[in-house]
Amino acid sequence: AFFRTGELEPCLYEVRAVTTDAAHARRVYEGFRRFSPEVGPFLRRAYWTCLPEKELAIYHFAAKLYREGKLLLQRLSDETYHPLLRAVRQLNGELEQYRGFVRFSDIGVLAAEIEPKNRVLPLLRGHFCQRCHDETFFLYDRTHREALFYADGHSAIVPLEEFVMAPPDEAEKRYRRLWRCFYDTIAIRERENPKLRMSHMPKRFWPLLTELQSDPDAIPPSPSPCAAFAAPGAPAAIPAPATRQAPAPSAPASAP
């Protein structure tokens, strides 16, 4: 097994420290190109997964790839290849979910927390730095105890053992209530499908989603769900006439 510095567990076997040789690692990484330009990025993502003993799994796959060549990449059920493929698919799925399930709060800067199974923060870095390039923000990973900081076009991922989100001020509470109001207003009660929602938005994400948190400062219900947020003197909303929803186009047949 491989252990990082500070993570060594008591064992009965001899432990040998391995010094990182960056030049050697670069040569090996570049050497993967002769098999496929996708091997290097694939193994990099495999390292960010939560696969148990992933370092050993990556080593066995890389050694076998050098022995057997690119034909190994066609054997998707290979005992050294398949576990990595499955782990990377799970990582990619979680990454896509967190691109949509991060909720920032304004506490002087934009702040958010995530609790992923895989180490997705390095992969989320480019997405949020590009999307929020005019902001100052940080994103804290509770699982891996690290945070992404961004300000003035510069970003860094640094270890952070503990972080407690500051309580929201009145302005932030109001924005949260507005977001919950929007979420509830666009819902079509007759078409609710809890099982489908959980398949697209698993319950483990819910505690950090603003729209699904309990609101101790909730505004009492009114005839219009968002009436409490209307500007003074604004006319009441006129309900839209009922419309019949057009059927969705059928998906094209997939290739065999």
Give the residues covered by each predicted segment.
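Extended, well-ordered protein cores
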Residues: 1-244
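Long, low-complexity, intrinsically disordered segments
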Residues: 241-256
